[in-house]
Amino acid sequence: MPGNSPIYYWDTCLFLAWLKDEERPTGEMDGVRDIIERSKKRDARIMTSVLTTTEALSARIPAGMDTLFQQMMRRVSRVGIDIKVASLAHDIRNYYAKGGGKTLSTPDAIHLATAIIFRVDEFHTFDGNGSRKSLGLLPLSGNVAGNRLAICKPETKRPQLDLRRPNPPSE
């Protein structure tokens, strides 16, 4: 039933992984493809920020994939950045900046704030390790600056056998 379908917030990296058909550890891309198929059947809803469009189209994606991306985005709920989102994103960045170590990038803070405000069921990302300067998102699951948010990789209900590569990369 569409009204009871789970709402999954997608970080930009998932759209990029799908557009580039990235080679990822076994099962990860199956999760991406499964959620896309479920959204086509209205068994799940994908939400993201309008920021994703800018991030995805400024990335290096294969020729012609921008059209495919635009078609896919018709089925995705895109949320604008308003004062509530901006304020919470600011608070989230400040919370992690207080530690003096790694912080969150502004786009990551906007994505997290949007997901929190819209009370999604899960925030999906592959961002586990972050970078030298930025925190990864997966380790924040459960408590994002004092806000409850489940953060995970998308999981499939029907794993596929990938015969394209004999040795899948490890994390």
Residues covered by each model-derived region:
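General small-molecule cofactor/ligand-binding pocket signal
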Residues: 47, 79-80, 150-152
